[in-house]
C-alpha cells in the first residue's frame, strides 16, 4: 500500500508543473490516493472479521475523496450490536492503522448514539453528509442507510441552513483579519475551500442533490457555475 501511495505522490510531483497550469487534474490524483486507502482499509477490516458486526465509514475529507498527503484519515465505525462487548479484533484494526503511520481520527458508535449526537450537534450532523461506507455486511449497510435517511428527515432544512450561515459569519470574523488578509488560510478564509464545502453541504441537505454539478435552478449564471465547478475540482 505504501509503495502505491509513493508512486502516486511521485507521479503528482512529476506532473506538478502541468497541474499548476491546469489544476483540475489534481482531482484525479486525489481520487487515486483515496482508492488505495479504501482498498487497504476495507481488506484489513474484512480480514479481521469485523464486517459481520461493524460498518466501516469514511467521513470528512476522506469521505469526500479529497485525501491529500497530509490529510487525516477520519473514520466512523458503526456498531450494529452495541450491547455486546467490543471485539478485540476492533482494537487490533485500530492498532494496525497506527502502525501504518496514518494520522487517524476515529469514533466507534451505535446507530442510536450517532443519531442522538447528530440531532444535538449540527457540526456532527454535517460530517454525516460526507459519509461513505467502506466495508460491512450487505444487511447491515442496508439497515444503516435506512437509519441515516430517517435522521436526515428529522433535521429541518431551514435550521441547517441558518446554522451554516451563522457558522460562515463567525468564520469570516475569525479569518478576515489583517493577518489573514496578508497570508490567507486557503481552507478557512472567506472565499476558500470551506465555502465550497458549505455550498456542497447546503445543496445536499436543502436541495437534496449530492453534487453541485447537478445544480439546475438558475442560482448561478453560466460563468459563475463554471468557476464554482472548477474550484470544486481544484480543491483550491
Where do the model's predicted regions map?
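N-terminal regions immediately upstream of nucleotidyltransferase
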Residues: 1-52, 70, 176-177
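Active-site phosphate/pyrophosphate-binding segments
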Residues: 26, 110-210, 220-222
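Conserved structured core elements
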Residues: 31, 35, 70, 87, ...
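Conserved catalytic core of two-metal-ion nucleotidyltransferases
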Residues: 34-38, 42, 48, 86-139
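Active-site nucleotide-donor binding segment shared across nucleotidyl transfer reactions
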Residues: 37-87
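Short, conserved phosphate-binding/catalytic loop or strand-edge motifs used
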Residues: 56, 70-76, 210-222
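Short, well-ordered alpha-helical packing segments
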Residues: 74-77, 90-98, 197-200, 229-232
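Conserved small/polar residues in nucleotide/adenosyl-binding loops
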Residues: 234-236
Amino acid at each position: 500500500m505504501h509503495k502505491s501511495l509513493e508512486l502516486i505522490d511521485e507521479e503528482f510531483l512529476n506532473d506538478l508543473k502541468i497541474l499548476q497550469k491546469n489544476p483540475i487534474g489534481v482531482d484525479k490524483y486525489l481520487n487515486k490516493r483515496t482508492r488505495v486507502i479504501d482498498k487497504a482499509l476495507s481488506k484489513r477490516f474484512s480480514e479481521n472479521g469485523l464486517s459481520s458486526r461493524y460498518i466501516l465509514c469514511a467521513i470528512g475529507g476522506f469521505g469526500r475523496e479529497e485525501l491529500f498527503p497530509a490529510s487525516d484519515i477520519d473514520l466512523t465505525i458503526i456498531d450494529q450490536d452495541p450491547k455486546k462487548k467490543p471485539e478485540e479484533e476492533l482494537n487490533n484494526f485500530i492498532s494496525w492503522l497506527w502502525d501504518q503511520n496514518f494520522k487517524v481520527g476515529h469514533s466507534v458508535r451505535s446507530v442510536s448514539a450517532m443519531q442522538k449526537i447528530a440531532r444535538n450537534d449540527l457540526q456532527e450532523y454535517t460530517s454525516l453528509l460526507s459519509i461513505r461506507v467502506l466495508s460491512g455486511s450487505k444487511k447491515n449497510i442496508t439497515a444503516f442507510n435506512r437509519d441515516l435517511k430517517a435522521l436526515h428527515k428529522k433535521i429541518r432544512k431551514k435550521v441547517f441552513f441558518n446554522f451554516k450561515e451563522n457558522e460562515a459569519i463567525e468564520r469570516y470574523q475569525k479569518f478576515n483579519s489583517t493577518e489573514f488578509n496578508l497570508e490567507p488560510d486557503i481552507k478557512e478564509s472567506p472565499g476558500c475551500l470551506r465555502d465550497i464545502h458549505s455550498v456542497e453541504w447546503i445543496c445536499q441537505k436543502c436541495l437534496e442533490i449530492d453534487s453541485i454539478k447537478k445544480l439546475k435552478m438558475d442560482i448561478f449564471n453560466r460563468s459563475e457555475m463554471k468557476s464554482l465547478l472548477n474550484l470544486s475540482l481544484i480543491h483550491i
